[in-house]
Every structure is written in C-alpha cells, then in structure tokens.
Amino acid sequence: MNLYDVIKKPLITEKTTIEKDSKNVVSFEVDRDANKIEIKEAVEKLFKVEVAEVNTVNVAGKVKRFGRHYGKRSNWKKAYVTLKEGSSVDFFEI
C-alpha cells in the first residue's frame, strides 16, 4: 500500500489536542485495510518523526436520517500514534 494512501487525514478535536500536549499522542483517520506496521512506517516517513507505538480503533458508521429515508455512514479506522520523546508533529505548520 502506498504511504499516501495509508493516512487519510489528521483528527483534530479537543480530546486529541489534550492527548497531544500531555501524552505526545497524535490521531489520524487511516485506511481501513492498513495495519499497525504500515501506519507506523507511513507516519515516520511522511512526518520524519520516531514512533513508539500505534493503537487502532475500528469505528462503526452511524445510522442517520436523510429526510424520510435512513442511511448509514461509512465505517472507518482511527489510529492513535504515540511518538517517542523529543518527536512532535504540528499539523498547522505542514
């Protein structure tokens, strides 16, 4: 899998900002077929940082109403990437 296909986008929320500041953990939306090894390699090469560990979560899509009809949002995968001491990623400077 191509490095640019593994990571879709960073997740920037209040929770992820607090984790980034306190635990040096950054969060990404990643491809559903990507494994932890591919995610680690992609983050290290694209952002030039050292990764300590990767945790992943499969997020189920919610059922939503569209007028009278019901539909389902797509399932997706979230990755919590713990960076080693001295490494950091600033999404707004990239």
From Swiss-Prot:
<dbReference type="GO" id="GO:0019843">
    <property type="term" value="F:rRNA binding"/>
</dbReference>
<keyword id="KW-0694">RNA-binding</keyword>
<dbReference type="GO" id="GO:0003735">
    <property type="term" value="F:structural constituent of ribosome"/>
</dbReference>
<dbReference type="InterPro" id="IPR012677">
    <property type="entry name" value="Nucleotide-bd_a/b_plait_sf"/>
</dbReference>
<comment type="similarity">
    <text>Belongs to the universal ribosomal protein uL23 family.</text>
</comment>
<keyword id="KW-0699">rRNA-binding</keyword>
<keyword id="KW-0689">Ribosomal protein</keyword>
<comment type="function">
    <text>One of the early assembly proteins it binds 23S rRNA. One of the proteins that surrounds the polypeptide exit tunnel on the outside of the ribosome. Forms the main docking site for trigger factor binding to the ribosome.</text>
</comment>
<dbReference type="GO" id="GO:0006412">
    <property type="term" value="P:translation"/>
</dbReference>
<dbReference type="Pfam" id="PF00276">
    <property type="entry name" value="Ribosomal_L23"/>
</dbReference>
<protein>
    <recommendedName>
        <fullName>Large ribosomal subunit protein uL23</fullName>
    </recommendedName>
</protein>
<comment type="subunit">
    <text>Part of the 50S ribosomal subunit. Contacts protein L29, and trigger factor when it is bound to the ribosome.</text>
</comment>
<dbReference type="GO" id="GO:0022625">
    <property type="term" value="C:cytosolic large ribosomal subunit"/>
</dbReference>
<dbReference type="InterPro" id="IPR013025">
    <property type="entry name" value="Ribosomal_uL23-like"/>
</dbReference>
<dbReference type="InterPro" id="IPR012678">
    <property type="entry name" value="Ribosomal_uL23/eL15/eS24_sf"/>
</dbReference>
<keyword id="KW-0687">Ribonucleoprotein</keyword>
<dbReference type="InterPro" id="IPR001014">
    <property type="entry name" value="Ribosomal_uL23_CS"/>
</dbReference>
